[in-house]
Amino acid sequence: MSDRAMSPALLFGFVAAYFGALLVVAWWTSRRAVEADFFVGGRSSHWALVAFGMVGTSLSGVTFISVPGAVGASGFGYLQIVIGHLLGYAVIAGVLLPLYYRLQLSSIYQSLATRFGPRSQRTGAGFFIASRTLGATARLYLVVRILHDMVLAPMGLPFWLTAAVILLMILLYTVEGGVKTIVWTDTLQTAGMLAGLLLCVAMLLAALDLTPAAAIARLAETGLSRVWGQDPMASGFWAKQLLAGAFIAIAMTGLDQEMMQKNISVRTLRGAQQNMLALALIMQVVVLLFLLLGGLLQLFALQHGLAARGDALFPAVVTGYLPAAVQLVFVLALISALFPSADGALTALTASTCIDLLDLQQRGDARSRKRIRRAVHLGFAALFMALVLVFRWIDDRSMIGLILKIAGYTYGPLLGLFAFGLLTRRAASDAAVPWIALAAPLLCGLVDFNQRALFGRYEIGLELLLLNGAITFALLWLASRPGDQGFAPNPGSMRTSAVARNEGSVATQTQTKKPR
């Protein structure tokens, strides 16, 4: 066991320096930002920058810990889901992005208002807010727990203080610039996460005295690199996983304000589509590297008789068996994986609440809008804090399974709503949509809870999302009548875009006229 553990105070110093660099980037990018830049970044982001930064947002600290930790139980089976993502990303690029750009939206749920009505917009936003709040705080909790155990607990500080410090860091660099800032900070942090991933793989290969080719051969011998599930009755069957992967990508990326707010900040539709396809390919390589890391951790655990499993394995190996420098790399990479998902969630939740629920862009003057937006931002930070403490109490062993389970219930109604709007021209009752969106997850829960009695050996896995979406679609069909409705440009969103451009123009003129 390593006796060269890095001092917690020194680790904290490096974390503080890293955060200082993020604050500098945040200050630089938000210097001339107008209020609309918080929501769509002035629609001037470069597609390559967004694609690279979205890798970090898509993965998060949960991927950094849970995906490698799950290799012992399911091998490389998670790759089935990620391969399925390719089809989902193609649907987003070919169907959803053209819709969002045609409607010129600040929030993607404004499209539901043009198709069904204002209650549907609020329902879509409400399910996104519930889903992203729970998912983001589950991700946040996992990383906060590890950072607390490694850095602040040895200094005698309580868990709640660790969570508060990290949330304060995120709040400070997102409160002004919003999307305009996080496009840049997420790029910086994704680079840090990937560098940390590669260094950890290299250090484990060295510790095991293996070349990459020899490591792959060893993983094949032990069965850890198995990908395809062959039992049709099991939840890990390959066809289920591929299909679930496609719909998870559509729902958790294409119908998610956090992920799409960066895409619709790109200058052109073509650029946004290039970003989505580039992201799809990069994700295949990055997840494969995480699975390789997980396989190496399992080999290391077998070699050293380690009892740690699941989410506890990676931190146990780093803190107990590898050189002190690797601890620093691990901590900085973990923070780099955490911040892009947490900062994007905080910004997107603020944006969706302000636009979809409060109709902020049609209210008062710019100063009052900014005051309300800041209050909402602070409110979500406080909610994040409370939920992190709840997850501390739950303390699930594998957070990625919990997050995907939550997504199956909360993204299903969104999937059904958008599918009905795109695939049919029927006129659904706007008043019925909120009730349908609530009924579908409840019916899914009944099926899930009684699946053994209903289906015998057949296990419902991630296809719960598809079932939820299908129930929503069917109920919408029953509550609709023949018609000729489609997604139409929203006059409100056009007016909002004009106001934003006007504010940006006024701000630019003011800066130009300022005396030297």
Language-model region placement:
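Long, low-complexity, intrinsically disordered segments
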Residues: N502-R516
